């Protein structure tokens, strides 16, 4: 069995005697390796830094502290430890890529984004720029890079730093297109994941899970595949994902350990302390630990994961055959990335600044600043100083009308998690006081349902007859809100809100109307998902249990319908009275589209492609049309409904649905969130299934397997594999890819037409380019 050192070809184990002084704060237990080509990396970084400074001057950007953000330290270069086994001919370009990523991140304004080991690390506020300027830079870079990648159309960026960054990516892909494209896919996935959630009011376990999913770990690993020239399939990566995720978790928590003072300082200066996303901060805020206690916990958690990784790797090695050599290199590279990053962070100026404006006393103000009662961290003693701290009580469990267990704390906390809906409730004068306050309504608390004070006056004894003649009392909304609050708390990319903002660049809707339209679309979308999951018998939604698995079918339906009432109320508050007619019109279309889907499934009737498109335009396209029509109705500029924009949104709805159909069968990430080929379990007539039934020699076999099952049972795994094999034989997935490529080209043509009529919209262009099939299908 090869040892870890045997796998390394271009590096040697670190000699701690070579480092003076030795980093005092280094605690990782992983072995650390050092590249034999350190000088080349340092030289390449120095030259790139000089060019970047000149480009910043040309662009008028304030970047006078690059020395704190660069990869080079007084002991060496980040890459010599993080990517020690980089093949010699790629060392210089890899050094440039790392510096480019750090410098770019250094300009980002502090808005609550994550700080990551491999790509986005803490930055100095004095070097950051405004959100508006950063948005302009990002769009300039994104359009140039994605246009070239998706369509081969080369567009030179306007900013000098973007010209440098785009050239780095071009060189990166040119050296190795296979791993280069894979790297870009992971980079985009990392950026998408960062948009999904913040970490306020989150448990430690959930925090670690979220950080692994949203951090730059997979991005850094994909760079490692490029640096080390590792050729590994997605299936092989998936087979050892449990080990790479374990390594990433340790590295991410290590980053939290080293970066906390820096991150706190950034957020304190920018007034965003409520959005700091760091494990030390979470343990202080949600669990009441001091900074020292929290850092000790983080350190233990890192070491635990490192030991588990080493044990897991050794166990895997004992049973791995000679054909797994590339997987072994992949795993060792991942471990080296984490160990090298930890060594670098233990002494890099980026994490050990002496010019912070805040102190340990300032950071201590986070202790106990949770939104509710403090949590208890399993496996660790409570904070030493518990004076004045209220521990979170254990939630009592109740059963709903369908016998499903639900926790009362989930109900009581729903308004905390539900940002959009909670904002609506606060602005609605028809709603009474909530969550334990006395008013005309009852409340649902950890002690159970509490009667309103007025009603209690009529019920002085259990045998009182007064309750039968008491005045009307409006019931509390907590129980009705709870299922919606749950689905609204799940991670989401918020793409519809983003699209609304981008369309508004054309339509110029007043801020108050735009906010209401966002609420309308958001609530309508989530309520439709609650109903869809019931109608499709889906067990998962966004990688978490579907709403009805917690709250039961009856309560979930009631909550979804209750949200429709809220949506109608919001629509009536828009300025243009025509908005209610628009809403009714598109809601009618949405339900008609859904009825087609359900009808075909119930009667096992395969629709034609033309019928499928009609269903998509009504069901999926309904929300897109609703967005556009409401924006147009509320627009502050006199402009008729634009047909070019309407076509753009129609094609966008089709692309979303067909992409979803394809990913359901072909994406490992989708499988983790919804299950393996879930559309087969639902009996859904997706585009791939319609194509298969139109081309296979044995359509009856497929329909018999799909529709002659015991209700409520999933299609057996072997049958799913059979259907996928049949799709392979008739090239169904290849056809789906061709449709997506064609549809995306038409989308971009429709955007060109819309821009010719309405003016350029870089935000919409970047968003649509980012959805393109090149990254999706690679």
Curated annotation (Swiss-Prot):
Residues 429-445 have a biased composition (Polar residues). Mg(2+) 3 binds at residues 532, 536. Dimethylallyl diphosphate binds at residues 541, 619-620, 657, 664, 674. Residues 211-214, 259-263, 350-351 are annotated as: Substrate. Residues 423-445 are annotated as: Disordered. GO terms for molecular function: geranylgeranyl diphosphate synthase activity; lyase activity; metal ion binding. Disruption phenotype: Abolishes the production of the ophiobolin family sesterterpenoid. Mg(2+) 4 binds at residues 532, 536. Keywords: Isoprene biosynthesis, Lyase, Magnesium, Metal-binding, Multifunctional enzyme, Transferase. Mg(2+) 1 binds at residue 105. Its EC number is 4.2.3.-, 2.5.1.-. Pathway: Secondary metabolite biosynthesis; terpenoid biosynthesis. It catalyses: 4 isopentenyl diphosphate + dimethylallyl diphosphate = (2E,6E,10E,14E)-geranylfarnesyl diphosphate + 4 diphosphate; (2E,6E,10E,14E)-geranylfarnesyl diphosphate + H2O = preaspterpenacid acid I + diphosphate. Substrate binds at residues 105, 255. One of its GO terms (biological process) is terpenoid biosynthetic process. PROSITE patterns: POLYPRENYL_SYNTHASE_1. Residues 360-774 are annotated as: Geranylfarneyl diphosphate synthase. PANTHER family: GERANYLGERANYL PYROPHOSPHATE SYNTHASE. Sesterterpenoid synthase; part of the gene cluster that mediates the biosynthesis of aspterpenacids. Performs both prenyl transferase and terpene cyclase activity, converting isopentenyl diphosphate and dimethylallyl diphosphate into geranylfarnesyl diphosphate (GFPP) and then converting GFPP into preaspterpenacid I. C22-oxidative modification of preaspterpenacid I by the cytochrome P450 monooxygenase sttB then leads to preaspterpenacid II. It has still to be determined how preaspterpenacid II is further modified to produce aspterpenacids. This is Preaspterpenacid I synthase sttA.
